[in-house]
Amino acid sequence: MTYSLRILDLPESDRPRERLIAQGAKYLTHAELLAILLGTGQGPGKLSAVGLGQHVLQHFSEHQQDPLTVLRDVNASELTTIQGIGPAKATTILAAIELGKRICQARPPELTVIDDPAVAAAALAGELMWQSQERFAVLLLDVKHRLLGTQVVSIGTATETLAHPRDIFREIIRKGATRAIVAHNHPSGQTDPSPEDLELTQQLLSGAQILGLPLLDHLILGNGDFTSLRQTTSLWNDCPQDL
């Protein structure tokens, strides 16, 4: 695609809005999604809206990170330093980013059945996703795996959390839950478990066996993604739970 070509000069099948309607948003490039928000082009060389979207992404790729990661936390003053992005375009982008965060953080209502790691991660996203510090939280469930509530047990630093099995089980017992899923976030966005994560999970599984309070999973959340330790490790085989 020629980025200086006007959107209206493109065949309809190549126009971002028409492609979104015909094929769905997931088939659009990052630049095309930005183009829909921007509406019109500008910037160096009088770029099209798609070209301006690509220019924005290239600007943020100079941070040696995924430009979407940088864009997630950008502010209006940073956006308006980019040629072609004025206050109107900047606020549209920021509003879309914030709406996306809120949708990601929306959690199911209480008494929803938590029968899948993705449902559990969605229920905890509001507490854990996009946080700059590590947080450790617990999903409190009844015997039918229905959600009774969520509880943040501890807040740590940018690189570690300070959760202790004693504090976690105290919350589970205090709230009258009979099943639990624990989770924490990695501010780095990486969801691979650390040796400390695995060690804590082993301790929790052993404690859950003794107390008769099955631990259903331990999730690690980051950058809109998650890892289920029950699905990716053998810890539950080594320390079976009455699920």
Curated annotation (Swiss-Prot):
Superkingdom of origin: Bacteria
Motif (JAMM motif): 184-197
Taxonomic placement: Bacteria, Bacillati, Cyanobacteriota, Cyanophyceae, Acaryochloridales
Domain MPN: 113-235
Single GO MF descriptor: metal ion binding
Pfam families attached to this UniProt entry: RadC, UPF0758_N
GO BP, sorted A to Z: proteolysis
Sorted UniProt keywords: Hydrolase, Metal-binding, Metalloprotease, Protease, Zinc
Binding site for Zn(2+): H184, H186, D197
Protein's name according to its UniProt entry: UPF0758 protein AM1_4368
Protein family (similarity comment): Belongs to the UPF0758 family.
Keyword 4Fe-4S: no
InterPro entries in UniProt: MPN, RadC_JAB, UPF0758, UPF0758_CS, UPF0758_N
